């Protein structure tokens, strides 16, 4: 937030995110040698603490914040319902906990966090510092694996896999080394 504010005078905490995390940067050392070129060095993966909700409750946490800045309604709806479902399962078997609110949430879909926009997930410094907190190759959502390219022919390709594709779906290709193409 300080970085954003210093560059643009805009505060992401006040709804004015300039999305510097979406831009490519190069990293140059003190001797002027380029270490990294054109990577998304500020593109953090999404923090996902779903696996640790019970530990958070046991530690006294009583409210959660999801990433909602510049996210669309489907993201907020899906991720909120996903956490709600996990919390309700814990509350159902842990009578020492109770809801802080009187209302209840309803939804007509099965919430799946991985189906919402994300750059991959990370527990981000949960118990230790991990090396997988960033998504250097792209600031975009990678979606879910749908299959493997089996044949390239001119401007077309054949995919072998189990996932159904629909009109409007975007595709990202990775080569054998895992590089995005």
Where on the chain are the PLM-derived regions?
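Surface-exposed amphipathic alpha-helical tracts and adjacent flexible/coil segments at the periphery
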Residues: 1-181
């Amino acid at each position: 937030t300080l970085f954003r504010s210093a560059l643009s005078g805009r505060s992401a905490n006040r709804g004015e995110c300039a999305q510097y995390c979406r831009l490519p940067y190069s990293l140059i050392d003190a001797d002027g040698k380029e270490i990294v070129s054109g990577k998304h060095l500020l593109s953090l993966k999404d923090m996902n603490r779903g696996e640790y909700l019970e530990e958070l409750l046991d530690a006294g946490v009583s409210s959660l914040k999801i990433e909602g800045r510049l996210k669309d309604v489907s993201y907020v709806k899906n991720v909120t319902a996903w956490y709600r479902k996990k919390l309700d399962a814990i509350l159902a078997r842990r009578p020492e906990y109770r809801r802080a609110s009187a209302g209840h949430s309803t939804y007509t879909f099965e919430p799946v966090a991985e189906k919402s926009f994300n750059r991959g997930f990370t527990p981000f410094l949960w118990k230790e510092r991990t090396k997988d907190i960033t998504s250097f190759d792209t600031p975009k959502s990678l979606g879910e694996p749908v299959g493997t390219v089996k044949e390239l022919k001119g401007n077309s390709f054949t995919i072998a896999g189990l996932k159904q594709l629909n009109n409007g779906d975007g595709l990202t290709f990775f080569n054998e080394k895992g590089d995005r193409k």
